[in-house]
Protein backbone atom coordinates (compact mmCIF):
# COMPACT_ATOMS: atom_id res chain seq x y z
CA UNK A 1 0.00 0.00 0.00
CA UNK A 2 1.39 3.40 -0.98
CA UNK A 3 2.10 5.93 1.72
CA UNK A 4 -0.03 9.10 1.73
CA UNK A 5 1.47 12.28 0.30
CA UNK A 6 2.70 15.31 2.26
CA UNK A 7 4.39 18.53 1.14
CA UNK A 8 7.07 20.48 3.00
CA UNK A 9 7.46 24.17 2.13
CA UNK A 10 10.54 25.32 4.02
CA UNK A 11 12.66 28.44 3.92
CA UNK A 12 14.22 31.24 5.94
CA UNK A 13 12.17 33.96 7.56
CA UNK A 14 10.82 36.66 5.19
CA UNK A 15 11.22 34.42 2.13
CA UNK A 16 7.56 34.41 1.08
CA UNK A 17 6.40 31.03 2.39
CA UNK A 18 3.00 32.23 3.60
CA UNK A 19 2.10 33.98 0.34
CA UNK A 20 3.04 30.90 -1.66
CA UNK A 21 1.09 28.60 0.66
CA UNK A 22 -2.04 30.74 0.26
CA UNK A 23 -1.67 30.67 -3.52
CA UNK A 24 -1.27 26.88 -3.49
CA UNK A 25 -4.32 26.48 -1.26
CA UNK A 26 -6.41 28.03 -4.04
CA UNK A 27 -5.18 25.51 -6.63
CA UNK A 28 -4.44 22.28 -4.78
CA UNK A 29 -6.39 20.03 -2.39
CA UNK A 30 -4.11 20.97 0.51
CA UNK A 31 -4.50 22.05 4.12
CA UNK A 32 -1.78 24.07 5.82
CA UNK A 33 0.04 23.04 8.99
CA UNK A 34 2.32 25.69 10.49
CA UNK A 35 5.88 24.59 11.28
CA UNK A 36 6.89 27.61 13.33
CA UNK A 37 7.88 27.68 17.00
CA UNK A 38 6.69 31.29 17.36
CA UNK A 39 3.31 31.11 15.60
CA UNK A 40 2.04 28.64 18.20
CA UNK A 41 1.66 31.50 20.70
CA UNK A 42 -1.45 33.60 21.21
CA UNK A 43 -1.10 37.39 21.67
CA UNK A 44 2.01 37.34 19.46
CA UNK A 45 0.79 38.31 16.00
CA UNK A 46 2.78 41.25 14.65
CA UNK A 47 6.30 40.27 15.68
CA UNK A 48 5.87 36.70 14.43
CA UNK A 49 4.48 37.87 11.05
CA UNK A 50 1.49 35.64 11.74
CA UNK A 51 -0.94 35.34 8.81
CA UNK A 52 -3.69 37.94 9.06
CA UNK A 53 -7.36 37.11 9.58
CA UNK A 54 -7.96 37.72 5.87
CA UNK A 55 -5.11 35.37 4.93
CA UNK A 56 -6.31 32.70 7.34
CA UNK A 57 -9.78 32.94 5.82
CA UNK A 58 -8.23 32.00 2.47
CA UNK A 59 -5.91 29.33 3.89
CA UNK A 60 -6.61 28.19 7.46
CA UNK A 61 -3.45 27.16 9.32
CA UNK A 62 -3.28 24.43 11.93
CA UNK A 63 -0.92 24.72 14.93
CA UNK A 64 -1.06 28.48 15.31
CA UNK A 65 -2.49 30.27 18.37
CA UNK A 66 -2.54 27.07 20.42
CA UNK A 67 -0.57 28.14 23.52
CA UNK A 68 -0.30 31.03 25.96
CA UNK A 69 3.12 32.76 25.91
CA UNK A 70 3.91 31.48 29.41
CA UNK A 71 3.83 27.87 28.16
CA UNK A 72 6.67 25.90 26.59
CA UNK A 73 6.53 23.81 23.43
CA UNK A 74 9.06 21.32 22.14
CA UNK A 75 9.86 19.26 19.06
CA UNK A 76 8.24 16.34 20.88
CA UNK A 77 4.98 18.27 21.25
CA UNK A 78 5.13 19.36 17.63
CA UNK A 79 5.81 15.81 16.44
CA UNK A 80 2.67 14.52 18.14
CA UNK A 81 0.49 17.48 17.13
CA UNK A 82 1.66 17.48 13.51
CA UNK A 83 1.18 13.73 13.05
CA UNK A 84 -2.36 14.03 14.43
CA UNK A 85 -3.13 16.95 12.09
CA UNK A 86 -1.60 15.16 9.09
CA UNK A 87 -3.65 12.03 9.74
CA UNK A 88 -6.81 14.11 10.05
CA UNK A 89 -6.12 15.96 6.78
CA UNK A 90 -5.24 12.75 4.93
CA UNK A 91 -8.42 11.06 6.19
CA UNK A 92 -10.43 13.91 4.66
CA UNK A 93 -8.89 13.20 1.25
CA UNK A 94 -6.62 16.25 1.25
CA UNK A 95 -2.85 16.73 1.34
CA UNK A 96 -0.95 18.12 4.35
CA UNK A 97 1.10 21.18 3.36
CA UNK A 98 3.60 21.91 6.13
CA UNK A 99 4.84 25.49 5.97
CA UNK A 100 7.42 27.23 8.15
CA UNK A 101 11.03 27.73 9.07
CA UNK A 102 11.57 25.79 12.32
CA UNK A 103 13.93 23.25 10.84
CA UNK A 104 14.24 21.17 13.99
CA UNK A 105 10.52 20.41 13.74
CA UNK A 106 10.88 19.18 10.16
CA UNK A 107 13.83 17.03 11.20
CA UNK A 108 11.81 15.52 14.04
CA UNK A 109 9.05 14.60 11.62
CA UNK A 110 11.32 13.13 8.95
CA UNK A 111 13.67 11.18 11.19
CA UNK A 112 11.56 10.55 14.26
CA UNK A 113 12.34 11.57 17.80
CA UNK A 114 15.27 10.34 19.81
CA UNK A 115 14.33 8.56 23.06
CA UNK A 116 14.79 11.55 25.37
CA UNK A 117 13.28 11.51 28.87
CA UNK A 118 10.45 13.78 29.94
CA UNK A 119 11.23 16.83 32.05
CA UNK A 120 11.86 16.24 35.75
CA UNK A 121 10.88 19.22 37.89
CA UNK A 122 12.98 18.14 40.89
CA UNK A 123 16.19 17.88 38.86
CA UNK A 124 15.49 21.13 37.03
CA UNK A 125 15.00 22.92 40.35
CA UNK A 126 18.33 21.59 41.63
CA UNK A 127 20.10 22.72 38.46
CA UNK A 128 18.55 26.19 38.73
CA UNK A 129 19.55 26.43 42.39
CA UNK A 130 23.14 25.66 41.43
CA UNK A 131 22.94 28.29 38.68
CA UNK A 132 21.64 30.89 41.12
CA UNK A 133 24.63 30.26 43.36
CA UNK A 134 27.44 29.76 40.84
CA UNK A 135 26.08 31.06 37.52
CA UNK A 136 25.11 29.40 34.25
CA UNK A 137 28.69 29.73 32.95
CA UNK A 138 29.75 27.29 35.67
CA UNK A 139 27.11 24.80 34.56
CA UNK A 140 28.12 25.27 30.93
CA UNK A 141 31.68 24.36 31.93
CA UNK A 142 30.30 21.26 33.64
CA UNK A 143 28.42 20.39 30.45
CA UNK A 144 31.68 20.71 28.52
CA UNK A 145 33.08 17.82 30.57
CA UNK A 146 29.92 15.71 30.15
CA UNK A 147 29.08 16.43 26.50
CA UNK A 148 31.70 18.50 24.63
CA UNK A 149 29.78 18.48 21.35
CA UNK A 150 26.52 19.70 22.87
CA UNK A 151 28.38 22.32 24.91
CA UNK A 152 30.07 23.65 21.77
CA UNK A 153 26.64 24.23 20.22
CA UNK A 154 25.04 25.86 23.27
CA UNK A 155 25.79 29.43 24.30
CA UNK A 156 27.09 29.78 27.86
CA UNK A 157 24.13 32.08 28.63
CA UNK A 158 21.45 29.80 27.17
CA UNK A 159 20.00 28.64 30.48
CA UNK A 160 17.13 26.67 28.95
CA UNK A 161 19.31 24.45 26.76
CA UNK A 162 22.04 24.01 29.40
CA UNK A 163 19.40 22.95 31.91
CA UNK A 164 17.89 20.43 29.50
CA UNK A 165 21.25 18.93 28.48
CA UNK A 166 22.27 18.42 32.12
CA UNK A 167 18.82 17.14 33.06
CA UNK A 168 19.00 14.46 30.34
CA UNK A 169 22.40 13.32 31.61
CA UNK A 170 21.28 13.14 35.24
CA UNK A 171 18.15 11.18 34.29
CA UNK A 172 19.74 8.67 31.90
CA UNK A 173 23.47 8.58 32.59
CA UNK A 174 23.99 9.28 28.87
CA UNK A 175 24.71 12.63 27.31
CA UNK A 176 22.47 14.43 24.84
CA UNK A 177 24.74 13.68 21.88
CA UNK A 178 24.60 9.94 22.53
CA UNK A 179 20.83 9.88 22.89
CA UNK A 180 20.03 12.05 19.89
CA UNK A 181 22.10 9.69 17.73
CA UNK A 182 19.47 7.01 18.41
CA UNK A 183 16.92 7.59 15.68
CA UNK A 184 13.19 7.21 16.14
CA UNK A 185 10.49 6.05 13.73
CA UNK A 186 10.50 7.80 10.34
CA UNK A 187 7.57 9.72 8.91
CA UNK A 188 5.00 7.37 7.28
CA UNK A 189 4.40 9.68 4.30
CA UNK A 190 5.75 10.26 0.82
CA UNK A 191 7.16 13.74 1.22
CA UNK A 192 7.91 16.22 -1.53
CA UNK A 193 10.20 18.89 -0.13
CA UNK A 194 10.56 22.48 -1.32
CA UNK A 195 12.58 25.42 -0.03
CA UNK A 196 12.00 29.03 -1.02
CA UNK A 197 14.55 31.85 -0.71
CA UNK A 198 15.94 34.75 -2.75
CA UNK A 199 19.00 33.76 -4.75
CA UNK A 200 20.97 36.70 -3.32
CA UNK A 201 21.51 36.94 0.44
CA UNK A 202 21.48 40.75 0.24
CA UNK A 203 17.90 40.59 -1.03
CA UNK A 204 16.84 38.50 1.95
CA UNK A 205 18.59 40.91 4.34
CA UNK A 206 16.74 43.82 2.74
CA UNK A 207 13.39 42.01 3.02
CA UNK A 208 14.06 41.28 6.69
CA UNK A 209 14.86 44.91 7.45
CA UNK A 210 11.83 46.20 5.55
CA UNK A 211 9.54 43.72 7.27
CA UNK A 212 10.86 44.62 10.73
CA UNK A 213 10.22 48.32 10.15
CA UNK A 214 6.75 47.46 8.84
CA UNK A 215 6.05 45.48 12.01
CA UNK A 216 7.03 48.51 14.06
CA UNK A 217 4.57 50.62 12.05
CA UNK A 218 1.85 48.05 12.71
CA UNK A 219 2.32 48.32 16.48
CA UNK A 220 4.90 45.68 17.41
CA UNK A 221 6.13 47.67 20.41
CA UNK A 222 2.57 48.01 21.72
CA UNK A 223 2.09 44.27 21.31
CA UNK A 224 5.16 43.57 23.46
CA UNK A 225 4.11 46.24 25.99
CA UNK A 226 0.90 44.29 26.58
CA UNK A 227 2.87 41.10 27.18
CA UNK A 228 5.28 42.95 29.48
CA UNK A 229 2.39 44.43 31.47
CA UNK A 230 0.88 41.01 32.18
CA UNK A 231 3.38 40.43 34.97
CA UNK A 232 3.51 36.65 34.60
CA UNK A 233 6.05 36.52 31.76
CA UNK A 234 9.85 36.76 31.88
CA UNK A 235 12.71 36.93 29.35
CA UNK A 236 13.78 33.30 29.81
CA UNK A 237 10.50 31.95 28.44
CA UNK A 238 10.73 30.51 24.90
CA UNK A 239 8.02 32.92 23.70
CA UNK A 240 9.89 35.99 24.90
CA UNK A 241 13.17 34.63 23.51
CA UNK A 242 11.74 34.80 19.97
CA UNK A 243 13.64 37.20 17.72
CA UNK A 244 12.31 40.72 17.99
CA UNK A 245 10.42 40.04 21.21
CA UNK A 246 13.62 39.61 23.20
CA UNK A 247 14.98 42.93 21.96
CA UNK A 248 11.71 44.84 22.56
CA UNK A 249 11.56 43.30 26.04
CA UNK A 250 15.09 44.55 26.76
CA UNK A 251 13.98 48.03 25.69
CA UNK A 252 10.94 47.96 27.97
CA UNK A 253 13.16 46.78 30.83
CA UNK A 254 15.30 49.89 30.33
CA UNK A 255 18.34 47.95 29.14
CA UNK A 256 18.58 49.39 25.61
CA UNK A 257 17.05 52.24 23.61
CA UNK A 258 14.28 51.69 21.08
CA UNK A 259 16.67 52.35 18.20
CA UNK A 260 19.05 49.73 19.63
CA UNK A 261 16.18 47.27 20.03
CA UNK A 262 15.17 47.73 16.40
CA UNK A 263 18.76 47.38 15.18
CA UNK A 264 19.41 44.30 17.32
CA UNK A 265 16.07 42.81 16.32
CA UNK A 266 16.95 43.12 12.64
CA UNK A 267 20.41 41.62 13.26
CA UNK A 268 18.92 38.72 15.25
CA UNK A 269 16.41 38.03 12.48
CA UNK A 270 19.21 37.97 9.91
CA UNK A 271 21.14 35.53 12.10
CA UNK A 272 18.02 33.35 12.32
CA UNK A 273 17.74 33.35 8.53
CA UNK A 274 21.41 32.40 8.25
CA UNK A 275 20.89 29.43 10.59
CA UNK A 276 17.81 28.34 8.65
CA UNK A 277 19.71 28.43 5.36
CA UNK A 278 22.58 26.49 6.93
CA UNK A 279 20.10 23.78 7.94
CA UNK A 280 18.65 23.67 4.44
CA UNK A 281 22.01 23.52 2.66
CA UNK A 282 22.99 20.55 4.80
CA UNK A 283 19.60 18.84 4.45
CA UNK A 284 19.92 15.10 3.86
CA UNK A 285 16.80 14.75 1.71
CA UNK A 286 16.33 16.07 -1.81
CA UNK A 287 14.95 19.61 -1.94
CA UNK A 288 13.54 21.53 -4.89
CA UNK A 289 14.60 25.17 -4.54
CA UNK A 290 12.23 28.01 -5.41
CA UNK A 291 12.96 31.70 -6.01
CA UNK A 292 11.27 34.18 -3.66
CA UNK A 293 11.38 36.85 -6.37
CA UNK A 294 9.40 34.73 -8.85
CA UNK A 295 6.32 33.47 -6.97
CA UNK A 296 4.40 32.53 -10.14
CA UNK A 297 7.22 30.31 -11.39
CA UNK A 298 7.62 28.84 -7.89
CA UNK A 299 3.96 27.91 -7.77
CA UNK A 300 4.10 26.33 -11.22
CA UNK A 301 7.22 24.37 -10.31
CA UNK A 302 5.58 22.96 -7.19
CA UNK A 303 2.48 21.84 -9.08
CA UNK A 304 4.59 20.32 -11.85
CA UNK A 305 6.70 18.39 -9.35
CA UNK A 306 3.61 17.06 -7.60
CA UNK A 307 2.11 15.87 -10.88
CA UNK A 308 5.34 14.19 -11.95
CA UNK A 309 6.14 12.53 -8.65
CA UNK A 310 2.96 11.70 -6.81
CA UNK A 311 -0.47 12.73 -7.99
CA UNK A 312 -2.59 13.84 -10.90
CA UNK A 313 -4.11 17.21 -10.06
UniProtKB/Swiss-Prot annotation:
Name its co-factor(s). Mg(2+)
Q: Report residue spans for region: Interaction with substrate tRNA.
A: 36-39, 160-164, 241-246
Molecular function per GO: ATP binding; tRNA dimethylallyltransferase activity
Q: Which residues bind substrate?
A: 13-18
Q: Name one GO biological process term.
A: tRNA modification
Q: Enumerate the catalysed reactions.
A: adenosine(37) in tRNA + dimethylallyl diphosphate = N(6)-dimethylallyladenosine(37) in tRNA + diphosphate
Swiss-Prot/TrEMBL keywords: ATP-binding, Magnesium, Nucleotide-binding, Transferase, tRNA processing
**Taxonomic superkingdom:** Bacteria
Keyword Transcription regulation in annotation: no
Q: Where is coiled-coil annotated?
A: none
Primary role? Catalyzes the transfer of a dimethylallyl group onto the adenine at position 37 in tRNAs that read codons beginning with uridine, leading to the formation of N6-(dimethylallyl)adenosine (i(6)A).
Q: Cite the record's note on assembly.
A: Monomer.
Record protein name field: tRNA dimethylallyltransferase
Q: What is the lineage of its organism?
A: Bacteria, Pseudomonadati, Pseudomonadota, Gammaproteobacteria, Pasteurellales
